[in-house]
Amino acid sequence: MTANNEKPELIPIDSGFSVLYKGKYLYSKRSPQKNILQVISSIVIQSETLVLCVSPVLGYGLKELLEKLPTDSFALGLEADEELLKLSKNKIDKNILEDSKFLYTGTDSINILLKQFDDFIKGKKIRRVIRIDFSGGAALNQSFYSQAFDFISQYISQIWINRLTLIQFGRNYARNFFKNYYSILRSILKSPDKSSALNINSCFGSLIEKSVNRPIIVIGAGPSLDSSIEFIKENRDRLFVLAVDAAFAGLYPEIRPDAVVLLESQYWIQKAFIGITDLDIPIIADLTSNPSLLVKLNGNKSFFFTDYSAQDSVASSFFSVLKEKNILPLRLEAMGSVGLAALALAERLAFDGLPIFHTGLDFSWGQGFSHSKLSYQVKNIFSDISKIKSLYTGESLFPNKLSFEKGKNGSLAFTSPNLKNYGELYKKLFASKENFFDIGQSGLELNSKKINFDTAKKIIDDFYSCGGVVDLNYEA
């Protein structure tokens, strides 16, 4: 949080107070309340709206805003400057600070803000967010406030995307969950070791947190994987290779993953494993993943659980009971992307500070393809070519709602709304992680810690030469 030796000074004037801080008046010297009251009087607030109140300082306008809010709308006060926060909490009416429709938070951390915001909106329906700057204090941390607004907007959007996904796929998720859970219970009953019945959780596999002590590379199936293959081959023996389901077939046999992450709930994912179901490679599977495929795979299986029910209070309470009774495996936030799930798993598996590389997480199209040329999706396209069926159909060449967005290294990336949303989730969850390194040379701009292959190799070399302790402040 922004702090300094300078203190904000209250300046008495005829109609109240202004604040002098860092050489600037944060309110008008003539009528400090006039501007904000005019804004609140003129603004239209729809139902199910969150109002982001930036730098409220003396609280002018908050009372009028809360009176104007629809019954199903709320206000979030945000202050990033420590000195202004102290002044603000002393000057704002306690009735406002204690109002159930208002949350006042002081932080300059997006992660802390989103955590407090998530707690605040539990059980509430928020469809949109609007921003109101309550004082000149908004200009002191303009970049952070803009970022906060963008992240909150994206957060709300993700909530509704999850709800729509649940409407479309919820029945399938639930069916798969109970089929897989029942299969685990049956394995307990058939086990000669009856003591396992006393600990159902042990049958979810050996997914032990902080159990990997080698640098991890998460391999997605995006186009950037193609340029990373040689690097992975050269350093294979020094890496823990965690591959997503769609990339597995293209890697094997030259690169045998240490584990494969399976997330997909629909039957089509079985195509990605044709001819490779009996390789005895460990599988880390979501309990909602396709049960028919899980039965065919003969590798050791560990399970995790994607919290797809977070927006459904009844289902969420059911899973909470399972968790309390310790009969639910590792629980992850619903992200919708197997690549993001693999990153979350890698973070759980790794010792603190262990380097985690990733490639193939482009969240965009490459030259003609949405996936790596090694992926089963691209191989499937080529296998379907015939005299009367070309490589590209209209929909595959020009998918619906594609757009150009900012790509890595100043380039443009061709992406879709869903892929762009995954990219925004990456920014929220992983972009700020010091030990995460992006070696993918193409794709959507993720604000990730991008490095080239030489730098990645140096990090690995340093890890082994320094006994597992490395300086994470590398530049490409």
How should these model regions be labeled?
Residues 348, 368-384, 403-412, 416-417:
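Acidic, contiguous segments within the catalytic cores of piggyBac-derived transposases
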Residues 239, 243-245, 253-297, 305-310, ...:
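Catalytic or ion-translocation cores adjacent to nucleophile or general acid/base/metal-coordination motifs
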Residues 215-225, 310-317:
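Short, composition-biased local secondary-structure segments
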Residues 1-216, 223-240, 252-257, 267-280, ...:
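N-terminal donor/sugar-recognition subdomains of glycan-related enzymes
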Residues 292-357, 361-363:
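Active-site/ligand-binding-proximal alpha/beta "capping" segment
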